[in-house]
Amino acid sequence: MTIEMLYSKIHRATVTDANLNYVGSITVDEELLEASMLRVGQKVEILNINNGERFSTYIILGERGKRDICLNGAAARKVHKGDKIIIVAYATYDEKELQNYKPRVVLVNDNNDIEEILESI
């Protein structure tokens, strides 16, 4: 049996921009991607804490150190600059993999600086 579980999330990221006139996606700072073990092109769920919106998109690479979190294309209609969001990725695990299951949780501050990295929910 396999089960879909949390793989990684960036918790309470601040939206730095919303660019409607761009091919759809979410731009994420390279350092945040590395810390969260997320990958360019990976499907992610976006949970908007401010308005309750939940939608999916894919990741594109943001410039290292700029702390950009930018929703692009149609997704830009679902957020406003300054909104708090959670960027979530799931993965499918089998029973054996679940014995050592440790999701990655990256906690960020209002400037999208990493405050803590957890390996638990």
From Swiss-Prot:
Pfam families: Asp_decarbox. The modification Pyruvic acid (Ser) is found at S25. Is synthesized initially as an inactive proenzyme, which is activated by self-cleavage at a specific serine bond to produce a beta-subunit with a hydroxyl group at its C-terminus and an alpha-subunit with a pyruvoyl group at its N-terminus. GO terms for molecular function: aspartate 1-decarboxylase activity. Binds 1 pyruvoyl group covalently per subunit. One of its GO terms (biological process) is alanine biosynthetic process. The keyword Metal-binding does not apply. The active site is at S25 (schiff-base intermediate with substrate), Y58 (proton donor). Its main location: cytoplasm. Its cofactor is pyruvate. Pathway: Cofactor biosynthesis; (R)-pantothenate biosynthesis; beta-alanine from L-aspartate: step 1/1. Its EC number is 4.1.1.11. It catalyses: L-aspartate + H(+) = beta-alanine + CO2. Substrate binds at T57, G73, A74, A75. It is an enzyme of class 4 (lyase). One of its GO terms (cellular component) is cytosol. The keyword Cytoplasm applies. Heterooctamer of four alpha and four beta subunits. This is Aspartate 1-decarboxylase. It comes from Sulfurimonas denitrificans (strain ATCC 33889 / DSM 1251). The gene is panD.
